[in-house]
Each structure stands twice: as C-alpha cells, then as structure tokens.
From Swiss-Prot:
InterPro entries: Mn/Fe_SOD (IPR001189), Mn/Fe_SOD_BS (IPR019833), Mn/Fe_SOD_C (IPR019832), Mn/Fe_SOD_N (IPR019831), Mn/Fe_SOD_N_sf (IPR036324), SOD_C_sf (IPR036314). Destroys superoxide anion radicals which are normally produced within the cells and which are toxic to biological systems. It comes from Leptolyngbya boryana. The gene is sodA2. Its EC number is 1.15.1.1. It comes from the Bacteria. Its cofactor is Mn(2+). This is Superoxide dismutase [Mn] 2. Homodimer. It is an enzyme of class 1 (oxidoreductase). It catalyses: 2 superoxide + 2 H(+) = H2O2 + O2. One of its GO terms (molecular function) is superoxide dismutase activity. Keywords: Manganese, Metal-binding, Oxidoreductase. Induction: By methyl viologen, and under conditions of iron or nitrogen stress.
C-alpha cells in the first residue's frame, strides 16, 4: 500500500470539551481512513504514482492519468488535509498564537483578533463542504482562503500553514448546524508550535 493512515497523535478525547471524542474517532478512523483507502485503490495500477508523496500528487495533478485524476484529487486532498488537521491541534492547545507566526499575523492582518474574525468569516461563508486556510500564497504573502470539498491549496500553488475542516462530519455531532460556534471553539485546541514549524517551512520554501 502506497499510503497509510497514521494514528492520531493524541487520545480521541484530548480535545474535549471543544471537539468531542466520538467525532474525533469517526472523523479519523472512518472518514480519513476512507480517503486513504480510496486513494490507494485509485493508484493501485500506477507504480509511478505510488512512489510520489501525497503533497506531490495534489501539486502535480497533471501527471495523474485522466481516468483516476478526479478520484486522486478528492482523496489525496482528503489525506493531506486531514494529516495537517490532526497535527496542528493538541491537548495543550492555546487560543493565542506564539512565536514567529504571531508577529506575521499581526503584520499581515493588523491583529490576531482581526485575523481570527476574517478566518472564521471565510469558514462560515464556505457554502457546503470545504476548508478554510491560512496559506503562503504564490506571491509569498499570507492569505486567508477557503476551498471546496477536499481541494488542497497546493492545487493552486499555495502552501497551507493551518486549516480548519468545515465539512459537517467535523462538527455536527456536537454543534449540529452551528458552524460559527464550532469555528470559534476550534481556536482553543491549536498547537502553535506545530503551526510555527509549518510557517517556517512555508516561508523558507521547504
């Protein structure tokens, strides 16, 4: 198998009370697992695709045969998006950024509160299923954007630094139709050390 589902880096209940254990278990063990399984099935007969990283797959969809391109776009996107999602959260999350990303957010958006409001607004306004992101754009600046379905910012040449899943499966058991409430609660579980690591890598081009 080319791709594997990594275990969650913390217990299912580690993000309580903001994200419940049942949601985490279903989200990781069922939804994310399905993306990995579907991706592996799609590339089973393409050994060259199996040797690519998931990031390379979504960055270079033009290299993917047309008969499996949409399946790879959806499921490789789901895999790379969720892998980041788990890693940028943690049991000892903090609501306020630390380190270099804090200064960069202030410089780009005026303040953390202004950034948070713009980020939450973008997530609230994403129609249907999708994601909201902070990215290093192709031009090198920080931008907030949202993508539909499981599309990764990598498809458009942007480097994701952090992202929140606004598919209903990410929050519906606890928040039902109250997506803005979920978006606001999510800030309490962020692992800013990991986000800083991704920020440094994005800004240095790695």
């Amino acid at each position: 198998m080319a791709f594997e589902l990594k275990p969650l880096p913390y217990a299912y209940d580690a993000l309580e009370p903001y994200i419940d254990a049942t949601t985490m278990q279903l989200h990781h063990d069922k939804h994310h697992a399905a993306y990995v399984n579907n991706l592996n099935a799609a590339i089973e007969k393409y050994s060259d695709l199996q040797s690519m990283s998931v990031e390379d797959l979504v960055t270079h969809l033009d290299r993917v045969p047309e008969d499996v391109r949409t399946t790879v776009r959806n499921n490789a996107g789901g895999h790379v998006n969720h892998t980041m999602f788990w890693e940028i959260m943690g049991a000892n999350g903090s609501g306020a950024p630390t380190g270099a990303i804090s200064e960069a957010i202030n410089n780009s958006f005026g303040s953390f509160d202004a950034f948070k409001q713009q980020f939450n607004d973008a997530g609230t306004k994403r129609f249907g299923s999708g994601w909201v992101w902070l990215v290093r754009s192709q031009q090198g600046d920080l931008q907030i954007l949202s993508t539909p379905n499981q599309d990764s910012p990598l498809i458009e040449g942007h480097t994701p630094i952090m992202g929140n899943d606004v598919w209903e499966h990410a929050y519906y058991l606890k928040y039902q139709n109250r997506r803005p409430e979920y978006l606001n609660a999510w800030w309490n579980v962020l692992n800013w050390e990991e986000i800083n690591r991704r920020f440094d890598a994005a800004m240095s081009g790695h």
